From Swiss-Prot:
Acts as a component of the essential kinetochore-associated NDC80 complex, which is required for chromosome segregation and spindle checkpoint activity. Required for kinetochore integrity and the organization of stable microtubule binding sites in the outer plate of the kinetochore. The NDC80 complex synergistically enhances the affinity of the SKA1 complex for microtubules and may allow the NDC80 complex to track depolymerizing microtubules. PANTHER family: KINETOCHORE PROTEIN SPC25, KINETOCHORE PROTEIN SPC25-RELATED. The gene is SPC25. Residues 72-147 form a coiled coil. Keywords: Cell cycle, Cell division, Centromere, Chromosome, Coiled coil, Kinetochore, Mitosis, Nucleus, Phosphoprotein. Residues 1-58 are annotated as: Interaction with the NDC80-NUF2 subcomplex. It is found in: Nucleus; Chromosome, Centromere, Kinetochore. This is Kinetochore protein Spc25. Belongs to the SPC25 family. GO terms for cellular component: cytosol; kinetochore; Ndc80 complex; nucleus.
Length: 226
């Protein structure tokens, strides 16, 4: 009876041991499998993380490069803006210079027109006075033996003859012109007359040219008889 119980107990012990070893063996295999799975998961995660980090680095590099490009563009835009402002200032200065030059040209044109009008008026007056001189000369040519010639420098040369009875063709002459003040100016008198300056001043005051010619002829005649 006791032997049977011992045999049964021994059998139970053996069954428990075998079952325990089987359970431990299965658990060990499961642990090894889990460990390998864990390693693979960690490796895959590390690879994914590495790829992600590299992508992040590229993104950072791209961002920095883009930021640098923006800085360069902003600098270039600022330089162009400064150049444009400088150009605008130069254009304004040139415009002011052109306006001043245009105004100056207009003033010169107006001054030229005034001077031209003054010269034209003076020339007309000069022509009228020369016409009067010529008319007076023509009137007295026969009576005074007077010949008038136009010579260099817009001068008129007055030549008297029939003064010296011994030499009727002997010339007595002087030259006449209008100076810048449009006054009579006598020169080149031959023979020389001391009173010529007085006659010149008188004709300037009276504008009586006929009397001037008569006085000059009388003065030449006085030289012959004195």
């Amino acid at each position: 009876m006791v032997e049977d119980e011992l045999a049964l107990f021994d059998k139970s012990i053996n069954e428990f041991w075998n079952k325990f070893k089987s359970t431990v063996s299965d658990t060990s295999c499961q642990m090894v499998g889990l460990r390998e799975t864990y390693k693979d998961s960690i490796k895959a995660f590390a690879e994914k993380l590495s790829v992600k980090l590299k992508e992040e680095e590229r993104m950072v590099e791209m961002f920095l490069e883009y930021q640098n490009q923006i800085c360069r563009q902003n600098k270039l835009i600022q330089e162009k803006k400064e150049n444009l402002l400088k150009l605008i200032a130069e254009v304004k200065d040139k415009k002011q210079e052109v306006e001043a030059l245009t105004a100056n040209i207009q003033d010169l044109k107006e001054e030229y027109a005034r001077k031209k009008e003054t010269i034209s008026t003076a020339n007309k007056a000069n022509e009228e006075r020369l016409k009067r001189l010529q008319k007076s000369a023509d009137l007295y040519k026969d009576r005074l033996g007077l010949e008038i010639r136009k010579i260099y420098g817009d001068k008129l040369q007055f030549i008297f003859t029939d003064i010296d009875p011994k030499h009727p063709d002997r010339p007595f002459m002087f030259s006449l012109c209008l100076n810048e003040a449009r006054d009579y100016e006598v020169s080149d008198c031959a023979p020389r007359l001391e009173c010529l300056a007085e006659f010149q001043e008188k004709v300037r005051q009276t504008n009586n040219f006929s009397a001037f010619l008569a006085n000059v002829r009388k003065a030449f005649t006085a030289l012959v008889y004195n």
